[in-house]
Amino acid sequence: MEKSAAGDNIDKYSPSSIPDYDTEFLNPDDLRAFEKALTDQDADPLVALNDWRPVYQRVVRRGRGRRKSAAAAPRRTKDETREGVLYTVLKWPFLLFVLGWITFLSVGYALTRIYIFLYEQWVTWRGKRESLRRELYKHENYDDWLHAAQALDEYLGNQRWKKIDEYAYYDHLTIRKLGRQLRTVRMQVEEEMKRGESGSTVVVEELCNLLEACVKANFAGVENPRLYSEAYSGTKDLVQDYIDEVHACVKVITDSRQARNEEKYSHFKHLDTNFGRTALCLSGGATFAYYHFGVVRALLDNEVLPSIITGTSGGALVAALVGTRTDDELKQLLVPALAHKIKACSEGFTTWARRWWRTGARFDTMDWARQCSWFCRGSTTFREAYERTGRILNVSCVPSDPHSPTILANYLTSPNCVIWSAVLASAAVPGILNPVVLMTKKRDGTLAPYSFGHKWKDGSLRTDIPIKALNLHFNVNFTIVSQVNPHINLFFFSSRGAVGRPVTHRKGRGWRGGFLGSAIEQYIKLDLNKWLKVLRHLELLPRPLGQDWSEIWLQKFSGTVTIWPKTVPSDFYHILSDPSPERLARMLRTGQQSTFPKIQFIKNRLKIEYAILEGLHRFSADGESVGATSIQPFPFDNGAAGADQKSNDPREERLNRNFPERSSEYSYDYVKSFSDFSDDPIVSAENSSVDDNYIVPSRQRDAGAEAGVGTGTAERRGSFSSLFNLEEMRRQSAVFFDDPDLYRDGGDL
């Protein structure tokens, strides 16, 4: 019987190994408030068929009963319907022709992938290299996997590639020269520290200048994924030595006594802004999302789990579990026994079939709310989760109104929003779960509808991977995407290899399946993408359930590092079924093994990022040392301001004037900062919201810094509003003059 990794006698398949297994976190009053919010409807105006018929009385005229069901079906509005004889005559024939051609291309694509698979099995993977490759899949521990990967690299000659500095996809001359300069200056600083000298600052300033010049995202191409796609383990020795040297230099600046604390703080703040942050993005995919548990487990065990996590649809449930638990709790939870708490699809066919016929949704919203609350630790809000774990949880939600903007719920945009309601909204796929109301926690702890009671649905329908929103709010420019959407996984193919998955024949310079196989695959996939865009731009696609379904194909689904857990055919059969402990164990193992090839790339990125954060947390802007506390994603105090603190946000004041009862019921506490961040892009991003429904916290500004720049808070907020207005004008004008996909998160299949 399998035991836990800690070495104790706890069975990983037993419910007793799950902490808080029998704990009911959700307050029944919260569930009743949610039920009331779902059933409450705005008052309907008094209407009648004409002046002499009763109000609200349904009177069916002769001949109208036959068209009743057809009239209720969602359709395009009059403004969206294109007029003209040719459009009316050619719309359906052209639509049928394109759909037929897409079907033909899909069959051709499937045959091409089968050919490439057979080519690799019969030509590429033979003999000893095949036996060494099989060794990779036998290990559930990263260290053992790494030894097997190094043995395979040695056999394939990839170790020799690592020792050669030259490579077309990065500037090796700059990296080599800069690495030597950093090493020389760092050794001088260390010598002065050993001699106890603290007066000279020239050498430290030189080291700081070098770091500010090179500590940037993808400087000289060192974060190019191609550098990690030529070997199973690691990258070129020159790149690895450079990253280790930069990390050592950042640590030396942190520990040096030659520079004042306020200078160190300013230095680390600039490094943090230039280098950016890393985020883990968990895609949707129904029960395929349980592969995310294995991905998170692999990152957690190797101490490379980012502090910024976002999830959509099924991925939102996994993200909520990660965002509300500490590391120690996660290590106990991410085991096969967790399957005993996953019971969302336990109903029989007759039960859910009657519900679907009656309500249009297969699953019951209240039942899902009750079960989802355990993963979110009850009615925990986004701010409370951040204060408890230090992790920044993000959940993508799409309004049921197709014309309203999406929201990335987190502790900045919706701090008092209850997490389980956002997870339900993100999983509300039309036909599976009806749109739900987001809930917010009031000052007395009770729940009330959020955003005026508007309803929300599945975020993956429009923003499966919200890269732009993450960059706006948290300066994220390095994304780790765990992609399990079944309709996307089928089309994933990297002809030149991926991170930790190189092309093995022709010394890495070949093509998977040969050049002909890769060329045919690329052509068919790009042609499929083209015809899907044609259908969308010509407005030929119908809208089942009132949803534009082309977005589920034409988004951007990948990131800087994309993890694709390998699925099996039985996953499609169980796509809406609860996993057994044995099946969850396989998904955990597969998720871990899919993550192992990416670990070294992620480690190199986070090694520098964590060193910068450590220096940023240790010092403050006023020159005082605050100690080496645990690293939080942002250098702000987790505590909130007092309840009597007044907001200086004009949007908050306007809402309080229009809704006097609101100010006494809702608590919008504001996060205090260790210091003033007047030029912090993250602070600016908070004040860039243009929607009055989303009240974001405002932070204190450095008056001296603002005076030096020559602009105040109000002027900054206005400049950001103007920026958004200009972007919106450019996007709308692109409809007439440019390709609209240039201004959206479009992505290839």
UniProtKB/Swiss-Prot annotation:
Residues 1-11, 646-659 have a biased composition (Basic and acidic residues). One of its GO terms (molecular function) is triacylglycerol lipase activity. CDD domains: Pat_PLPL. The active site is at S313 (nucleophile), D458 (proton acceptor). The keyword Amino-acid biosynthesis does not apply. It is an enzyme of class 3 (hydrolase). Residues 280-471 form the PNPLA domain. Its main location: membrane. One of its GO terms (cellular component) is lipid droplet. The chain crosses the membrane at residues 92-112. Residues 1-21, 630-659 are annotated as: Disordered. Its EC number is 3.1.1.-. Probable lipid hydrolase. Belongs to the PLPL family. This is Patatin-like phospholipase domain-containing protein AN0408. It comes from Emericella nidulans (strain FGSC A4 / ATCC 38163 / CBS 112.46 / NRRL 194 / M139) (Aspergillus nidulans).
